[in-house]
Structure formats: structure tokens, C-alpha cells
Amino acid sequence: MNWEDLRTKLKPAKDWIILNQLEDGSISWDQRGKCDPWDHCECLIALAIYEEWDAFDKGVDWFFNNINKDGLISPEFKNQQSVYNHFESHHAPYIVLPLMQAMLIRDEESFPKEYSPQINKIFDQLENFKDDDGYYYWAKDKKGLSDNSLITATMYILISLTARHERSFNLDLSKWDQKFDRDGTDRSRFSMDFYYPYLARVKNNKQEFDKHLEEFYVKGLGVKCVKEQPWVTIAESSECVLAALVNGNVTSAENIFNDILQFQDSAGIFPTGYQYDLKIFWPEEKSTWTNAAVIIAGHALCTFKDINERKGSNVFVNLSNFNKSN
């Protein structure tokens, strides 16, 4: 797969992201105006890949302008206003991923110095979410920390720490089942809980990956969000492509990515998901972060073989190589 050809094919997906960027720099899910900072960062990674620096820089500035004095950011904005009064542990640290992707494209050696004080504050605050066994509570509000840790949030915290070249984290894996999903909800139903540990390189067994993938992969369509539901989602499929790729399951990554390309519509934009029993796209939205995820996965697939070339490489592939060498 050639990146220049795919870059042209996916350009409308990138343009859709820019079309949904507000004047203040925030990137909405779609025309309805909701902005999730984590998804905003996902879109920034895609913009960095396309070297859309004006939109990228506006988006980065918006993010840091909305970091509070404690190094936290609201989990959702609507009409440029914060919606909730709690904070999620993995949101603020994720900004280092788009910054690192920009570094790789621009062939720079460090994050912009003007953001260093806030980045330091973000990661200092992150320590307040961590327990004695290295696990992170997923959220906190005025009453204190939540009583639960999530695989998804924790894995992206570890990815963000790696992007900052911090490998000091150490999870006591013997307490995995005890620590995660303490609210009693069975999250093994969700594909993200399967593949995120591989993306974070906490797990790395190729055979186990493909075995678990069978529970979620629908051949010819993509990856289901929830095991028992006939619903493939394009973002989860794209993230699973990344996880498979960095884990060495390259054929699986290529198959999934080729499957989801069929869902690009006549305008070149991807839907959020497809309910294959009813043969309908659901929900009725074309989320920007879904289109960003496709771009990131496609770029990774096209460039991962150039592992000796730092410049222009994909941030997730680059981080997986950093993990292997440390």
C-alpha cells in the first residue's frame, strides 16, 4: 500500500475534520458542535500527518487554553463551554501524541518549549490518579477519585507516558482483574478492552491476539465494538489495525483496513458504524474522530516498514519501536 495514493484517497476525510473545526480551534464530532478533548487530539494527529499546520496549531492552542490551573481538561465541550464537572485521567496527557506526530513529520527533536510548563503540570497531576500498584483511576470530581480503573483509559495513559519518553510505570499484572472494572461491569464484551493492551505493548503475544480477534472480527466488514452486537465501528476497526500492526499481526491489520475502506461514501467521508443485520449506517453521524482514526491507521500501514527512518513515521509505530528498545 502506497501512502501517496492513500493520502489522496483519504483527503476528503481530512477535509471533513477541518470543516468541523470551530473558530476557537476546537474540533467537533460533527456539525452538532460537541467536542471531546481526547477525540480532538485524535483529529490533531491526522492533521499533523497531512501537514495541515494552521488547523493543527489552532487545535493545539485551543487544547492548552482549556487546561486548567491543575493540569486538567473538561471531558466535553458544547458551544465552546465545558459541559461536565469531572475530569478523566487520560484526556489531558493525550495531547503529547499529536505533538509527537508533528515532531516526526517536521523532523524535530522536542515538543515546542512554550507548552513545556503545561505539559509538566499535566503529568504531575496524572500522578494524583495513580494508586500504589501503578493503576490509574479513570476520573475524579470535587468529591474525589472514582472507585474504578478502566483498561482503555489506563492503556492510553501508558501510551502518553511513552510518548513523553517515560518508562517508569510498572503495573502489577497479577492484580489486573482485581484493579480493572471494579464496578462489576463485564467489559470483556468490548473490543477496545481486548486490543488496547496490545497497542500499549503491555501484551505482545501474536497467537493470543489473533485468537481474541476472532471474537470481534467480521470478515469482510471490520471489527465489532461489542462482541454480541451486529455492529462494526470504523474507529475501533482502525485502532485494532494499529494494535495488530505494532504487535506483528500484519496480515490481520491489512485485512481489517481493506475491509473498512468500502465504507467511504461518495463524498469520501467515513461513517461511525455499520449495523450489518439491518444493513444501515448507525448512528447517523460521520464523526471526525472516526475519519481521523482511518487516516492514522492507513498512514501507519503505509509507513511501518520504514522503521529506520524517524522522519515522517507514524507516532504509534514509532512508540512501539521505542517500547521494544527499552
Model regions: which residues?
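Well-ordered alpha-helical scaffold segments within catalytic/enzyme domains
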Residues: 1-3, 41-55, 93-111, 155-168, ...
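Low-complexity, Ser/Thr/Pro/Gly-enriched N-terminal "stalk/linker" regions
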Residues: 1-38, 46-74, 120, 127, ...
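Extended ligand-binding clefts on enzyme/binding-domain cores
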Residues: 12, 113-238
